[in-house]
Amino acid sequence: MKKTFTGVVVSDKADKTVSVKVERRFAHPLYGKVVTRSHKYAAHDENNEYKIGDRVEIIAVRPISKTKTWKVTKLIERPRGIETTLAETEVAGGEA
């Protein structure tokens, strides 16, 4: 069984690649405080379909490049309230 994580896309600038931030929470072994740790994974996005803010699931795959060993398997949720992206605003004439 391959390892899977759920995270949020934090960058989609590269071609066929997205950066996915995965957060994990755990209780500190000595003090008991809940600690949050995060890690960014470079994940393969074949069709450039995932955008910043999307919650996605990634799965471990064979190495695709030097830093890419993860692939986006599915979209879990898109952020609400963001109707236009920066690129759409620039095409429309820069009026926001």
Curated annotation (Swiss-Prot):
Superkingdom of origin: Bacteria
One protein family per Pfam: Ribosomal_S17
InterPro entries: NA-bd_OB-fold (IPR012340), Ribosomal_uS17 (IPR000266), Ribosomal_uS17_bact/chlr (IPR019984)
Single GO MF annotation: rRNA binding
One term under GO cellular component: cytosolic small ribosomal subunit
UniProt keyword rRNA-binding, yes or no: yes
Family classification: Belongs to the universal ribosomal protein uS17 family.
Alphabetical list of PANTHER family matching this protein: 40S RIBOSOMAL PROTEIN S11 FAMILY MEMBER (PTHR10744), SMALL RIBOSOMAL SUBUNIT PROTEIN US17M (PTHR10744:SF1)
Name of protein: Small ribosomal subunit protein uS17
Native organism: Deinococcus radiodurans (strain ATCC 13939 / DSM 20539 / JCM 16871 / CCUG 27074 / LMG 4051 / NBRC 15346 / NCIMB 9279 / VKM B-1422 / R1)
The gene coding this protein: rpsQ
